Amino acid sequence: MSFIITVIGAGHAGLEAAFIVSKFNIKVNLLVLDINHLGSCPCNPSIGGPAKGIVTREIDVLGGMQAIAADNNALQYKLLNSSKGPAVQAIRAQIDKIGYKNWFQSQVKLNKNINLIQSEAINLIVRNEKIKGVILKDGSELLSDAVIITTGTYLRSKTYCGNTVKNQGPDQSKNSEKLSTNLINRGFKTIRLKTGTPPRILKTSLDYNQMELEINNNQNLAFSTTNKNFLPLEKQIPCYLVHTNQKIHDLILKNLKKSAMFNGSISAQGPLYCPSIEDKVFKFSQKPRHQIFVEPESLSLDTIYLAGLSTSFTPEIQKEIIQLLPGFQNAEIKKFGYAIEYDAFLSNQLKPTLETKLIENLYFAGQINGTSGYEEAAGQGLMAGINAALKLLKKPPFILQRNEAYIGVMINDLVTKTISDPYRLLTSRAEYRLWLRNDNVQERLIKKSFELGLTDKKTYELFLKKEKKKQELISFLKNTQVGKVKALKFTNKNTAQSLYDFNKRSEINLDKLIKDLPEKYQLDSETLKQIEIEIKYEGYIKKNEKYFKGLDKLSKIKIPHTFDYHKVKNLASEAIFKLSNFKPSNLAIASQIAGVNFNDIIAIKHFLKTYE
């Protein structure tokens, strides 16, 4: 039996959804308002960052596209937090935003399962609370077995630049008015959110000698775990750093009423971790300066991007601010910054599969769920696509737990909590961040990916071969005493200590130690680093594993969808309200809902066992 899934929107979430669905050999209608905006990066010209870069790698292992697209269009790579612990390290890449968009457009054309349609979806076809398709602006219908809505910041969106307000999407594109209204009419609860973007500057109008060059010594970096064609350092495009100053701060504080953020035009909540420059200066007046990163946008564009300077000031004030920055005295602004306000929908209206609770086979992914960022959007698109396909194929859902992936952390947060501002993934959100690392993504997810048919046999067998060598080395380290290695005999008084325990010392590096071992243990630096992390942080990881097992046991205790929590004695009223609203499918999910405590879980567990 053949199926058709319609994906509304072709940004980072929509593209991942479309491509992953196509891997299940299911036909996809991919709807986009303007084909020229397919795969666009309307804000920052970068992929990755703390937690986000790990998500991009998780997407890659699970058969997604973002990592490959970024690697094919990278201008520069950085390993962030390299001087800190492994739990917070992640890759970030400056990308060629035009090349990135063109790459995705070419991939869509090559995919025989994806039917690209330039049109606007204005309503859904629903029968008996089950999706049947979408209605287009011209009145035509696209019958579909499932629909995934990935509309980004386009729903009833407005842009703000000073006192100028326009009904449009990012980069002066069309917006979507009717779809959001019709979703609200069907009972979905909405929230109004806001984000912003900085002005773009003509790169030849700047004096880079007055800026601080961002030194980059990172080599052999890539998002895709299968990509070994690394971008050489000498070919990487540099970024620069400048800072705001007191003159800029005084100018901003004097002219706050000329910003849409402060003149009453915008009531929507903006991103907590990415505020506008006027918001930063106003809220953090004690700070003498703020960082502004000068970043390339594309080899085929004559503009640069100012990370850290998003604004909704009038063009006149924007120009004054820019020309007070070091090296920007003669700066020419090619495009002014603006704020954008849009509809999102409360994500606690979704199941952990990202299927809506109100309408069967309807899925939401990306910024429609109140998230910010390309990586968060792509991760949701991937998971919505996988689960939409699996459901049609009558296979079990694919849900990543908080201890398995950052994607799991994000989706669990979204469906169990109430979002009040644009959600951004942070390492601090993950309780198991020492396990959810940049280096062990394959180890965590490739088996699941292979079982889903999203990783090919050759890639999986290469991983198993590498894993076997890794375990052989670990076994050798555990069973070999320091005294047996001549080069180490006099460096340690305790010669009976195993090499494994010897490597737990902070000053010992496994890659140096390995040079004195037999040739068959000479593994690649990436694998050695992974082993070293696991040895040095063994105690913490084991503690996490113990908790994982407890969580796994809870996940096996199912809760009926119609379960009445009022019948459970000693259950807190907040827990009754939250659980009745969310309807978790098992105790593990119930335990992660904000407002549900340990005693509540024990009470429910006891009740379920008593009344089985």
Curated annotation (Swiss-Prot):
Protein name according to UniProt: tRNA uridine 5-carboxymethylaminomethyl modification enzyme MnmG
Subunit and interaction comment: Homodimer. Heterotetramer of two MnmE and two MnmG subunits.
Matching InterPro entries: FAD/NAD-bd_sf (IPR036188), GIDA_C_N (IPR049312), MnmG (IPR004416), MnmG-rel (IPR002218), MnmG-rel_CS (IPR020595), MnmG_C (IPR026904), MnmG_C_subdom (IPR047001), MnmG_C_subdom_sf (IPR044920)
Functional summary from the UniProt entry: NAD-binding protein involved in the addition of a carboxymethylaminomethyl (cmnm) group at the wobble position (U34) of certain tRNAs, forming tRNA-cmnm(5)s(2)U34.
Source species, domain of life: Bacteria
Gene Ontology cellular component list: cytosol
Positions contributing to NAD(+) binding: 270-284
Species of the source: Mycoplasma genitalium (strain ATCC 33530 / DSM 19775 / NCTC 10195 / G37)
Molecular functions (GO terms): flavin adenine dinucleotide binding
Gene3D superfamilies: FAD/NAD(P)-binding domain, GidA associated domain, C-terminal subdomain, tRNA uridine 5-carboxymethylaminomethyl modification enzyme MnmG/GidA
Binding, FAD: 9-14
GO biological process per UniProt: tRNA methylation; tRNA wobble uridine modification
Reported cofactor(s): FAD
Alphabetic keyword roster: Cytoplasm, FAD, Flavoprotein, NAD, tRNA processing
Upper lineage: Bacteria, Bacillati, Mycoplasmatota, Mycoplasmoidales, Mycoplasmoidaceae
Keyword Flavoprotein included in the entry's annotation: yes
Name of the gene this protein is made from: mnmG
